[in-house]
């Protein structure tokens, strides 16, 4: 059984995973029930698992092709090993995502569900209503990256954190730490470091602006 999580931590995770699935205007989101958010979150994870396993299968096929040519070229063996290792890493990622699918319902049973729903919807509504302002803050804190080129999950983790800091009165440290934890669960190996760096710059920028007021 997973460890107990705070309602807001569960809400952030559900908001992140349901964001791409839940549509509609901000005022319509208030009618969304928790089971709809959960279904959207599970669909997102299922889609991620499917895509990851497809990539893994592709790497295995490429490795097999390289091995078939390996009788005359030793370099092909090395290349095949690299592809096989990549496929194994992708498979591990898919297994981790599958674990998250199983954990989410358990997390909900261990926490206060009305708080989870309310805060998840507050995040989603804020992201809809304040999208341009949130994007502007993130865009101004990126180094050698463009907002629209960010991986979707990384971009959404940043959006949630900035929305919390700007509009939901979440302390900087809490918003950053929670975003880093989400990145550790759902981003790639270096994702949490990237998220942490961007949000530190966001924090520095916003604090500097506040000091001038």
UniProtKB/Swiss-Prot annotation:
Disulfide bond sites: none
Keywords in alphabetical order: RNA-binding, Transcription, Transcription antitermination, Transcription regulation
InterPro entries membership: NusB-like_sf, NusB_fam, NusB_RsmB_TIM44
Gene Ontology molecular function terms on file: RNA binding
GO biological process: DNA-templated transcription termination; transcription antitermination
Top-level taxon: Bacteria
GO cellular component terms attached to this protein's record: cytosol
SUPFAM superfamilies linked: NusB-like
Family: Belongs to the NusB family.
NCBIfam families found in the cross-reference section: nusB (TIGR01951)
Function: Involved in transcription antitermination. Required for transcription of ribosomal RNA (rRNA) genes. Binds specifically to the boxA antiterminator sequence of the ribosomal RNA (rrn) operons.
Name of the protein in question: Transcription antitermination protein NusB
Organism in which the protein naturally occurs: Picosynechococcus sp. (strain ATCC 27264 / PCC 7002 / PR-6) (Agmenellum quadruplicatum)
UniProt gene name: nusB
């Amino acid at each position: 059984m997973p460890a107990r999580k705070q309602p807001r931590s569960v809400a952030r995770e559900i908001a992140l995973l349901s964001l791409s699935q839940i549509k509609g205007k901000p005022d319509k989101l208030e009618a969304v029930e928790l089971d709809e958010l959960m279904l959207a979150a599970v669909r997102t994870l299922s889609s991620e698992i499917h895509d990851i396993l497809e990539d893994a299968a592709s790497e295995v096929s490429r490795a097999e092709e390289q091995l078939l040519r390996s009788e005359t070229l030793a370099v092909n063996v090395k290349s095949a090993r690299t592809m096989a290792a990549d496929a194994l890493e992708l498979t591990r990622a898919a297994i981790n995502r599958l674990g998250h699918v199983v954990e989410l319902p358990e997390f909900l049973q261990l926490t206060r569900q009305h708080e989870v729903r309310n805060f998840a919807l507050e995040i989603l509504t804020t992201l809809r209503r304040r999208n341009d302002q949130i994007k502007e803050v993130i865009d101004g804190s990126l180094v050698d990256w463009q907002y629209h080129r960010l991986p979707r999950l990384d971009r959404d983790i940043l959006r949630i954190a900035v929305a919390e800091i700007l509009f939901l009165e979440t302390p900087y440290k809490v918003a950053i730490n929670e975003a880093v934890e989400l990145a550790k669960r759902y981003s790639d190996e270096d994702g949490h470091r990237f998220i942490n760096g961007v949000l530190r710059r966001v924090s520095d920028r916003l604090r500097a602006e506040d000091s001038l007021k």
